[in-house]
């Protein structure tokens, strides 16, 4: 199966003189439809790596390959915005939904931004909201939803443009374990059907074990593990 997303020798450092390394020569390839779990302690660089992968932060060196398009520190903001809108989906622990918009309006938004008509965006949003079991809450304000329902809206919004890959940063971190597994199963089911890859940063080992493989980040360095590899539960 073809690679749809890759990080090549990503290095990121902070500090006045860039003397504090956060990501050290990270290389990762993700195939179409593959789910990769990114685990590591708080402060290990998971969120920084996802921000770089999502073209929201620029690496000190290295490149990102998305749909056979190479992105480096020389890639323009305009090109990055285009790639984000057309090829990437994002889910965060704190969902960044628009509180003043309804469920339906939140999910329609990515399609409107990428040029779809309101009628098409509404049709597609209603279809995907049915898939995440929110068809009876289309006009409800976000503020009236439960935590699990809000994350289902976030999942629907991340998937509506059928991205190549969804970058999920602790997407169920604020939910209890049963709700987290239920919400992630909805994401996993739709992604599998549409062959969408997922890079999942999580502290939840129950979720991590649903991935195709595990990548651990430790002091900015990536190490890969298979799901059934001896000692995984000790990572």
From Swiss-Prot:
Record has Transport as a keyword: yes
Domain (ABC transporter) ranges: 5-235
Pfam families hit by this protein: ABC_tran
Record's bilayer topology term: Peripheral membrane protein
Record's keyword terms, sorted: ATP-binding, Cell inner membrane, Cell membrane, Membrane, Nucleotide-binding, Translocase, Transport
SUPFAM superfamilies: P-loop containing nucleoside triphosphate hydrolases
GO cellular component, one term: plasma membrane
Matches recorded under InterPro entries: AAA+_ATPase, ABC_transporter-like_ATP-bd, ABC_transporter-like_CS, MacB-like_ATP-bd, P-loop_NTPase
Gene3D superfamilies: P-loop containing nucleotide triphosphate hydrolases
GO molecular function, one term: ATP hydrolysis activity
Residues noted as binding ATP in the record, renumbered to the chain: 40-47
E.C. number: 7.6.2.-
Localization per Swiss-Prot or TrEMBL: Cell inner membrane
Subunit structure: The complex is composed of two ATP-binding proteins (LolD) and two transmembrane proteins (LolC and LolE).
Role played: Part of the ABC transporter complex LolCDE involved in the translocation of mature outer membrane-directed lipoproteins, from the inner membrane to the periplasmic chaperone, LolA. Responsible for the formation of the LolA-lipoprotein complex in an ATP-dependent manner.
Similarity comment: Belongs to the ABC transporter superfamily. Lipoprotein translocase (TC 3.A.1.125) family.
UniProt-recorded name of the protein: Lipoprotein-releasing system ATP-binding protein LolD
Organism: Ehrlichia chaffeensis (strain ATCC CRL-10679 / Arkansas)
